């Protein structure tokens, strides 16, 4: 059967499941589709947080039900991204997050597509495929966001 998982950004993920699947199984399927580790996922249905060992049937989750996915950050690091207008955006990251992932988080909060973002830290423009750790970005670090318009490099 099909169920839907709605994320905080409003994105809806469609999953193929059985009612005998455990919540663990569902989280693994979400990881396959979205790359979010199960230990960072909290699934909510009818206002209740779902426990890993229970099955969809235990919660009376039927075909075309919608679950809500909330992310829990374990040991997350809070950084700030400062825009040219002086606005500061707080973002939770993991040291292993790529710069591209950080740009996606900026997009979630500000609606600016990653392709238009240039992130600067310690005077350097950050490469998308590098991680926060590669640049020694840690809690309290402030990145500067510069906008690149119309495909400029």
Curated annotation (Swiss-Prot):
<keyword id="KW-0832">Ubl conjugation</keyword>
<keyword id="KW-0833">Ubl conjugation pathway</keyword>
<dbReference type="GO" id="GO:0019941">
    <property type="term" value="P:modification-dependent protein catabolic process"/>
</dbReference>
<feature type="domain" description="Ubiquitin-like 2">
    <location>
        <begin position="77"/>
        <end position="152"/>
    </location>
</feature>
<dbReference type="InterPro" id="IPR029071">
    <property type="entry name" value="Ubiquitin-like_domsf"/>
</dbReference>
<keyword id="KW-0677">Repeat</keyword>
<dbReference type="GO" id="GO:0016567">
    <property type="term" value="P:protein ubiquitination"/>
</dbReference>
<comment type="function">
    <text>Ubiquitin exists either covalently attached to another protein, or free (unanchored). When covalently bound, it is conjugated to target proteins via an isopeptide bond either as a monomer (monoubiquitin), a polymer linked via different Lys residues of the ubiquitin (polyubiquitin chains) or a linear polymer linked via the initiator Met of the ubiquitin (linear polyubiquitin chains).</text>
</comment>
<keyword id="KW-1017">Isopeptide bond</keyword>
<feature type="cross-link" description="Glycyl lysine isopeptide (Lys-Gly) (interchain with G-Cter in ubiquitin)">
    <location>
        <position position="48"/>
    </location>
</feature>
<feature type="cross-link" description="Glycyl lysine isopeptide (Gly-Lys) (interchain with K-? in acceptor proteins)">
    <location>
        <position position="152"/>
    </location>
</feature>
<dbReference type="InterPro" id="IPR038738">
    <property type="entry name" value="Nedd8-like"/>
</dbReference>
<keyword id="KW-0539">Nucleus</keyword>
<feature type="propeptide">
    <location>
        <position position="153"/>
    </location>
</feature>
<dbReference type="InterPro" id="IPR050158">
    <property type="entry name" value="Ubiquitin_ubiquitin-like"/>
</dbReference>
<feature type="cross-link" description="Glycyl lysine isopeptide (Gly-Lys) (interchain with K-? in acceptor proteins)">
    <location>
        <position position="76"/>
    </location>
</feature>
<feature type="domain" description="Ubiquitin-like 1">
    <location>
        <begin position="1"/>
        <end position="76"/>
    </location>
</feature>
<dbReference type="InterPro" id="IPR019956">
    <property type="entry name" value="Ubiquitin_dom"/>
</dbReference>
<dbReference type="InterPro" id="IPR000626">
    <property type="entry name" value="Ubiquitin-like_dom"/>
</dbReference>
<dbReference type="InterPro" id="IPR019954">
    <property type="entry name" value="Ubiquitin_CS"/>
</dbReference>
<dbReference type="GO" id="GO:0031386">
    <property type="term" value="F:protein tag activity"/>
</dbReference>
<protein>
    <recommendedName>
        <fullName>Ubiquitin-NEDD8-like protein RUB2</fullName>
    </recommendedName>
</protein>
<dbReference type="GO" id="GO:0031625">
    <property type="term" value="F:ubiquitin protein ligase binding"/>
</dbReference>
<dbReference type="GO" id="GO:0005737">
    <property type="term" value="C:cytoplasm"/>
</dbReference>
<keyword id="KW-0963">Cytoplasm</keyword>
<comment type="similarity">
    <text>Belongs to the ubiquitin family.</text>
</comment>
<dbReference type="GO" id="GO:0003729">
    <property type="term" value="F:mRNA binding"/>
</dbReference>
<feature type="cross-link" description="Glycyl lysine isopeptide (Lys-Gly) (interchain with G-Cter in ubiquitin)">
    <location>
        <position position="63"/>
    </location>
</feature>
<dbReference type="GO" id="GO:0005634">
    <property type="term" value="C:nucleus"/>
</dbReference>
<dbReference type="Pfam" id="PF00240">
    <property type="entry name" value="ubiquitin"/>
</dbReference>
């Amino acid at each position: 059967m099909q169920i839907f998982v709605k994320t905080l950004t409003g994105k809806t993920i469609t999953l193929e499941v059985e009612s005998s699947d455990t919540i663990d199984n569902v989280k693994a399927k979400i990881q396959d589709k979205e790359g979010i580790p199960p230990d960072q996922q909290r699934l909510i249905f009818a206002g209740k947080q779902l426990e890993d060992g229970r099955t969809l049937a235990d919660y009376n989750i039927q075909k075309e039900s919608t679950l809500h996915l909330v992310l829990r950050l374990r040991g997350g690091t809070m950084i700030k991204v400062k825009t040219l207008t002086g606005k500061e955006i707080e973002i939770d990251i993991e040291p292993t997050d790529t710069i591209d992932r950080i740009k996606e988080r900026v997009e979630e909060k500000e609606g600016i597509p990653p392709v238009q973002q240039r992130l600067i830290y310690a005077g350097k423009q950050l490469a998308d495929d590098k991680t926060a750790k590669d640049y020694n970005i840690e809690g309290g670090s402030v990145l500067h966001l510069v906008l690149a318009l119309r495909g400029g490099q």
